[in-house]
Amino acid sequence: MIENRPWLTIFSHTMLILGIAVILFPLYVAFVAATLDKQAVYAAPMTLIPGTHLLENIHNIWVNGVGTNSAPFWRMLLNSFVMAFSITLGKITVSMLSAFAIVWFRFPLRNLFFWMIFITLMLPVEVRIFPTVEVIANLKMLDSYAGLTLPLMASATATFLFRQFFMTLPDELVEAARIDGASPMRFFCDIVFPLSKTNLAALFVITFIYGWNQYLWPLLIITDVDLGTTVAGIKGMIATGEGTTEWNSVMAAMLLTLIPPVVIVLVMQRAFVRGLVDSEK
């Protein structure tokens, strides 16, 4: 029997409301700034009442971008979508096949190869990023979608998660597939892949957001403004030195950048939660 403690309920709800307020208030301020004109957004203190210029600001950045060296924002969104989707598809494909080979194929040093993959989790991004940039430069993949996406497709985390899930599948499945004469890829496509759908959904959401939020990598790889991504592009919209930042346009760009990952999470939230729960069983 669970004891009813009113004070604990009140405390829990109070902390929940405060947490939500702390998270949502900056987003509300950004939304208000996106609805104001240049004069109102620079007023001190800035009003917290939404204005009427939201559509005007969105249209301005959508067509013209922000600043003199900025691409139209629709192009940045397209580049970010291509990058995030390619990284997601590549990570899932490479990680699933790698884990499948490690779990079900018997070849020399397979455990050593797995631990070599796993050890990369212990290396900070800063240790790996500049050698990776040098490799991409030597392969002449700077300022290209291939340079943006290929180095980020390998994932030790995803490989580890798929390996742990595959190890929970009963050996009887493999034996039944062998008796039926199924090839390894037939076994993978007809049995392993359908059983992994909930895990795939969870990993898809996590990986898409990871790819969408990339900042440092596009900043190092891309110099062509037509290949810029939204997250790195927003940083470029902020003026330095004597320049003036159009904060209303920057905040409008930030709101547009939030929409795709939010839509992905809302559409796939049930499958995402189910995938996280199933992976813990």
Swiss-Prot record:
Regions that span the bilayer: 16-36, 85-105, 113-133, 142-162, 202-222, 247-267
Specify where it is mainly localized: membrane
Q: Which gene encodes it?
A: ugpE
**BP GO annotations:** transmembrane transport
> What protein name is recorded for this chain?
sn-glycerol-3-phosphate transport system permease protein UgpE
What Pfam families does the database record attribute to this sequence? BPD_transp_1
Tell me which species this is from: Shigella flexneri
Spell out the disulfide connections. none
Record-annotated ABC transmembrane type-1 domain positions = 77-268
User: What is the protein's known function?
Assistant: Part of the ABC transporter complex UgpBAEC involved in sn-glycerol-3-phosphate (G3P) import. Probably responsible for the translocation of the substrate across the membrane.
